[in-house]
Amino acid sequence: GTKYKVVYEPNMEDYLLCHAAFVLPAAFACYKTDGDLKKLRGDTAYLNRMIDANIEGYRAIRNAGHTILPKADENFESAAYRRICLRFFKLMCATSLGKLCASDHAMNAVDEMSGLNRDMKAFFDANGADYPVWRALEREAGRYLQ
């Protein structure tokens, strides 16, 4: 045994919305760099824009009446949340963690990520959300997203 404890999440709809809001900005980064996140090493401005896009997504989800999950992300507009995310994204871009956590999946699941992005944008639009940073990162992803 790994002693890893599986935790059941009864509110799967909200969890999946939040997961998409966190994962898609990372996928955009993968597409911007053709799967080589190390190209973003040291590009703190871009990494902060990834966090901004994530926050836009979380804000839209919360404002539509959904719960932000996991609970640890509830204070997503705090400086502490930004610091944690920035550390994580820097680690992803400086080590093989980015390949394991994001780019391998994103680069082999372009159709899935494109569909997920379309669904998230439809959700944002249906709920009157503003998401300019998300749209900018999406444009920078280039030819990958359909």
Task: Name these PLM-found stretches.
Residues 51, 55-146:
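NAD(P)-dependent Rossmann-like dehydrogenase/reductase catalytic/cofactor-binding core
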Residues 1-70:
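Internal alpha-helical scaffold of NAD(P)-dependent oxidoreductase catalytic cores
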